Amino acid sequence: MFYDEAKIFVKAGNGGNGAVSFHREKYIPRGGPDGGDGGRGGNVYLRVDPSLNTLLPFSYQRQFRAEDGQPGQGNNKNGRDGADLYIDVPPGTVVYDEATGAVLGDLLEPGEVLLVARGGFGGRGNQHFATPSRQAPRFAEKGEPGEERWLRLELKLLADVGLVGLPNAGKSTLLAAVSAARPKIADYPFTTLEPMLGVVSVPGREGGTFVLADLPGLIAGASRGAGLGHEFLRHVERTRLLIHVLDGSGGLEGRDPLEDFHTINAELAAYSASLAGKPQIVAVNKMDLPEAQANWPRIARALDELGYTAYPISAATGQGVGELIRATWERLQQLPRPERVAPPLRSHRVYTLDRSQERWEAIRLSPHHFALRGPKIERLTLMTDFSNPEAAERYQRLLARWGISRRLLALGIQPGDIVHVAGRELVWEPELAEAEQTRPRRRLTKRERLLKRAGLLEEPEEEIGEQ
């Protein structure tokens, strides 16, 4: 069975915890803190594997987790970083965030990679928190949790030309006649149940080839879910050109080929405006039958008035097929390459200072419940070991230094109220916050006063984790 959609869960590795350790060596009393940092958690990437052409492997495995970073150790030993996880996908895979619907990437080229979950930073060891007034810190940072999310993968086959038409119009027979593909062919509708690709060699054109996609036949109402073809119309979106195959004989039902032509185009337009605007070449098939030969003059005249070029062919006997393929190749040379669903992925990173990461927001949810939001405060919360009194004291000291405590007090927070942040519930204890606000500050030096007057001096802050 052909799988062109999948949902998977990806979880990046957690950062390793920082170590609490003190240097112990003969003849070196009071060696000081030497706890190492935790390792970074492994990232999760999607990678294009040209040997794949379906999302079938994701029907067996849906959850993927990268390796966690290792914890730090004493003697300033840092933990090992977690190994990155690479998940192979076929070319033409579009990646969506399942929660938001946002397009994360469009993977086309072999070897192309897309970062879909970032590993957590490792926590810093206690060596980083030593100060003149706190020479023996007995706390360290916890590792940051890795990102996790559900992804929706959608495969859009990479073909230059797509075959569209009603069921039993002869699309599969045409594909088999011009390529090495061997689709199932039978004299009943919906013989083709899944897309099939074939590489077409152009007669008389040295090295001239293009990829042709055969899709299940469309019927009236396909854009609303009728029939089978609507499930695979996404594969036509990447094509540059459509070959619209008509049954020139009208089939056993005696249909009007021109009505069939308008029916299919109406379904393409209802599904997507981009499909309706794709250039088309019309192939009037089954010209080996007397009914098709009788209908041909009327069909050719009507299509010419509509601005379409029609080619009489018989996929079964090969009549006119070579001329159709050469015309298709020449038309392709005039058409641009299709655009990506998402911008191309960069081979390098550009780092810029993002002040939005430092912003925070305090909200009163109810008389005794408050919430804090913002990347920096949430990250601090996740990396703080609240079971350690010194770590909890540092957390509250930073809240006061950043002005968060002052804002919560202005909102009317009282001792014992609950503060919700990063999925945790913290009980408000204002003693440390008030002490921090009233703690005397050292006098600025002359140089610092000049810098402050010029707006170039910022208040010192403790950094959270590795940058």
From Swiss-Prot:
Gene Ontology terms for molecular function: GTP binding; GTPase activity; magnesium ion binding
EC annotation from Swiss-Prot or TrEMBL: 3.6.5.-
Residues binding GTP, per UniProt: 165-172, 190-194, 214-217, 285-288, 314-316
GO biological process, one term: ribosome biogenesis
Annotated residues for binding of Mg(2+): 172, 192
Tree of life domain: Bacteria
Keywords for the protein's UniProt record, in alphabetical order: Cytoplasm, GTP-binding, Hydrolase, Magnesium, Metal-binding, Nucleotide-binding
Domain Obg, first and last residues per copy: 1-158
InterPro entries, per database record: G_OBG (IPR031167), GTP-bd (IPR006073), GTP-bd_Obg/CgtA (IPR014100), GTP-bd_prot_GTP1/OBG_C_sf (IPR036346), GTP1_OBG_dom (IPR006169), GTP1_OBG_dom_sf (IPR036726), OBG_GTPase (IPR045086), OCT_dom (IPR015349)
Cofactor(s) named in the record: Mg(2+)
Cellular component aspect of the GO annotation: cytoplasm
Keyword Acyltransferase appears in the UniProt entry: no
Gene3D superfamilies: GTP-binding protein OBG, C-terminal domain, GTP1/OBG domain, P-loop containing nucleotide triphosphate hydrolases
Subcellular localization: Cytoplasm
Residues of the OBG-type G domain: 159-333
Stretches assigned to the OCT domain: 352-430
Function: An essential GTPase which binds GTP, GDP and possibly (p)ppGpp with moderate affinity, with high nucleotide exchange rates and a fairly low GTP hydrolysis rate. Plays a role in control of the cell cycle, stress response, ribosome biogenesis and in those bacteria that undergo differentiation, in morphogenesis control.
Subunit structure: Monomer.
Similarity comment text for this entry: Belongs to the TRAFAC class OBG-HflX-like GTPase superfamily. OBG GTPase family.
Protein name (Swiss-Prot/TrEMBL): GTPase Obg
Taxonomic lineage of the native organism: Bacteria, Pseudomonadati, Thermomicrobiota, Thermomicrobia, Thermomicrobiales
